[in-house]
From Swiss-Prot:
Its cofactor is [4Fe-4S] cluster. It is found in: Cytoplasm. GO terms for cellular component: cytoplasm. Belongs to the radical SAM superfamily. RlmN family. This is Probable RNA methyltransferase MXAN_6459. It comes from Myxococcus xanthus (strain DK1622). Binds 1 [4Fe-4S] cluster. The cluster is coordinated with 3 cysteines and an exchangeable S-adenosyl-L-methionine. The active site is at E92 (proton acceptor), C333 (s-methylcysteine intermediate).
Length: 358
């Protein structure tokens, strides 16, 4: 049994033949996730783990591990990790500093991505496979192990569309939130979605405590389709209806991620389209400068951004500019594509064309 993949309830079921106390099972679970045990032996020999349970774990349990291939540190404190999985493929995670107090970890949910958003490097890899629960959690375990501050949040904004790996990402989030696991608050765990409407509606029905961030980028369908091909499958009216349902059921503002692209979606007509699309829906808008290493898309100039923020006042909704850090190490939104994948080496920052996406 893979100790990094089991919920507390699943662990209880797996150990039931040994008749351990609930406290003993919880101790095993906490040793893996709360305390970051490095091996089965560390778990088996943990205090308050009965000998018969420890012996059973030594004989039947495993704790696979991602291999850290590379770490890159940026001047702004962001750290990008490149992992090699024993199941195949390479994935990336980012440690994000929040002032001098804590970290948030950005994790990947898939190797590659099927959605092919035009400004996203991961989409250029194509879809390889979904990550398993343990592969998602091991990103957090290993990044946390090297952290000098507490980890207080996890965002599923790395490689892949988390709602297309629905079961595994939700299982991982539940363990992240569990008080005997990582003990991260539900509202501090966010899934970013490009707009897979059936999964969004399922998520709302099931009532999960985690937040969704909706990548809209343009409320003009023709523009959105140019950069987000999912628009052709799940068009804006369908997505906006799902966002309305999300906001109303949860009684909170929906987070609208808006990738700001110079000369593309920064005009008055773009702000007016947002107003029409989200009329009567409680939202907050996150503006994220595009970071496209190919140079095809450029971030807005300060003048463009200032003018657009003025235009957005018609929304009468909160608007914030999200800092997308780690640009020089390929850690910014949209640049996670695995430095090396299948023998192909992605350009290093010094070699890359002008930067920019999310």
């Amino acid at each position: 049994m893979n100790l990094k993949s089991l919920s507390l309830q699943e662990l209880e079921a797996a150990l039931a033949p040994l008749s351990p106390s609930p406290a003993a099972v919880r101790k095993v679970f906490a040793a893996v996730f709360a305390h970051g045990a490095q091996s089965v032996e560390d778990v088996a020999s943990a205090r308050q783990v009965p000998r018969r349970v420890g012996d059973h774990l030594r004989a039947h349990a495993e704790m696979p591990k991602l291999a850290i291939v590379e770490r890159r540190r940026a001047d702004d404190g962001f750290v990008k990790y490149l992992f090699d999985s024993p199941l195949g493929g390479r994935i990336e995670a980012v440690r994000i500093p929040i002032f001098d107090e804590k970290y948030v970890i950005c994790v990947s949910s898939q190797v590659g991505c099927a959605l092919a958003c035009d400004f996203c490097m991961t989409g250029k890899l194509g879809f390889k496979r979904n990550l398993q629960t343990w592969e998602i959690l091991d990103q957090v375990l290993q990044v946390r192990e090297e952290a000098d501050r507490p980890v207080r949040g996890v965002v599923f904004m790395g490689m892949g569309e988390p709602l297309l790996n629905y079961k595994e990402t939700l299982r991982a989030a539940d363990i992240l939130r569990h008080p005997a696991g990582f003990s991260i608050a539900g509202e501090a765990i966010t899934f970013s979605t490009a707009g897979h409407v059936p999964a969004i509606r399922r998520y709302v029905r099931e009532g999960h405590p985690y937040r969704l961030a909706f990548s809209v980028t343009s409320a003009i369908a023709e523009k959105r389709a140019k950069v987000l091909p999912i628009e052709k499958t799940h068009p804006l009216p369908e997505l906006i209806a799902a966002i309305r349902e999300y906001s109303e059921v949860r009684r909170e503002r929906a987070m609208i991620a808006y990738v700001a692209i110079s000369g593309f979606n920064m005009g008055r007509e773009d702000a007016e389209a947002l107003k029409v699309a989200f009329e009567g829906i409680r939202i907050k808008v996150d503006l994220i400068d595009v970071t496209d290493p190919t140079g095809k898309y450029l971030p807005p100039t300060p003048e463009e951004l200032s003018a657009f923020r003025d235009h957005l006042q018609i929304l009468k909704s909160p608007v914030a500019r999200r800092y997308s850090g780690g640009k020089e190490i390929g850690a910014a939104c949209g640049t996670l594509a695995a430095t090396q994948y299948g023998g192909t080496v992605m350009p290093r920052p010094a070699e890359a064309p002008p930067s920019t996406t999310p």
